[in-house]
Amino acid sequence: PDYDHALRPELTVRMIHEIYDAGIFPTVWKIEGSDDPKFYDHAATAISTYDKDSRIVTLGRNETLEQVCAWIKAGAQNDAMIGFAVGRTVFLDAIKKYISGQYTNQEAIEEIGRNYFTLYQTYKNAKTHE
């Protein structure tokens, strides 16, 4: 089966319950991305069962910028989502190009900045238009 759509949603909710049942109460949950708004709804419902103030950020998982933007748009529809936590999605390609000599230091910096700004704008626009 397709892990991201068939298994991840159920496993995420189960993991949330198991962590709370173990006595751990995260302030912010870093949850792997999904392009299905219902995924975030189910996660937020499970979280709010234990803690009405806990929130969600979506992870980048080293996916493409386009994919992470789709996840941000899907998640931003839920009030529990407060942002994103990305790393490799923003910088990995630019760093590889810099190391291989395809980019100057300045070009790498500019690409990383553009990538992060794209994610920020996507989140801001999705939250503004919810």
Per-range role (PLM):
Residues 31-129:
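Catalytic-face loop-and-helix region of soluble metabolic enzyme cores
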Residues 4, 15-18, 56, 70:
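Amphipathic, alpha-helical segments enriched in basic
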Residues 1-10, 63:
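Active-site mouth loops of central-metabolism enzymes
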Residues 8-9, 15-39, 60:
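Catalytic beta/alpha-barrel core
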